[in-house]
Amino acid sequence: MNNSAFTFQTLHPDTIMDALFKQGIRVDSGLTPLNSYENRVYQFQDEERRRFVVKFYRPERWTADQILEEHQFALQLVNDEVPVAAPVAFNGQTLLNHQGFYFAVFPSVGGRQFEADNIDQMEAVGRYLGRMHQTGRKQLFIHRPTIGLNEYLIEPRKLFEDATLIPSGLKAAFLKATDELIAAVTAHWREDFTVLRLHGDCHAGNILWRDGPMFVDLDDARNGPAIQDLWMLLNGDKAQQRMQLETIIEAYEEFSEFDTAEIGLIEPLRAMRLVYYLAWLMRHWADPAFPKNFPWLTGEDYWLRQTATFIEQAKVLQEPPLQLTPMY
């Protein structure tokens, strides 16, 4: 079984209930699916009216060792008083197995959506990211990957070459735009940055607000530069992004040193995310959930827009990076 073709069709509600029951959890409510395409995630309430989330991992995306590293990082963060949703241990085990599925149970953490344009909230997030990275620097992931050009650009480019989803009449222009974007990223990429363990997918949708931030979903945790956990929080025009980044860095540096040279990686990382995300969609197209939720991927208009986006991002990479005020 490879994770590209896997569809979760055998993960029935009874299978989920049985898996939880074997861990001593009796579900007293329905299973409410949460928004996750990579894995299958459900919220529920047990007989004691405690609320939990159960995550069933997509087979073969991560190995058991890689998932356990994610769990270990989350538990270390909780121990260091960083607000993250960490897995619950059953008989000392956080990674569980049922009928060939790896799964984990988490406490359900409610909260409002993080307001990316709220400077007070941004400052608090920056402070906790500094603490998160303080923990992240204590050791590196051994089994989980490090952010790099091969995973984010080279492998997706090979996938695009053979893809049948790309309309034949638009494929040459799309591949040309992809190659130009890869060349632009490669020219501006650095590998002399300090590597640490990261959240990996730290955008506003993965932060809840309950009198402070709560970080969720460490599924994309990996090694990489600190800026990876900062840049996706920025929004608006360059002036707004500058103010937001300065707010984050000032709070961040209460706990961790930040290398401002990494700001030059923001646009390369943005380009890498654009390419990687598209490849992710295409790899999972055999899963019925993807054609259902992303039907536009088969339309010519989408590929025209995607080609234009790649061309524009290649141009952005030729511009000077975001500049902080002189005090930085």
UniProtKB/Swiss-Prot annotation:
Induction: Expression is regulated by the CpxRA two-component regulatory system.
Protein name as it appears in the record: Stress response kinase A
Protein's cellular compartments: Cytoplasm
Record keywords: ATP-binding, Cytoplasm, Kinase, Magnesium, Metal-binding, Nucleotide-binding, Phosphoprotein, Serine/threonine-protein kinase, Stress response, Transferase
The species this protein was found in: Shigella flexneri
GO cellular component, as recorded: cytoplasm
Major localization class: cytoplasm
Documented EC number(s): 2.7.11.1
Residues binding Mg(2+), per UniProt: N206, D217
Enzyme class: transferase
Catalytic site positions: D201 (proton acceptor), D217
Family under the similarity heading: Belongs to the SrkA/RdoA protein kinase family.
Subunit structure, interactors included: Monomer.
Catalytic activity, as annotated: L-seryl-[protein] + ATP = O-phospho-L-seryl-[protein] + ADP + H(+); L-threonyl-[protein] + ATP = O-phospho-L-threonyl-[protein] + ADP + H(+)
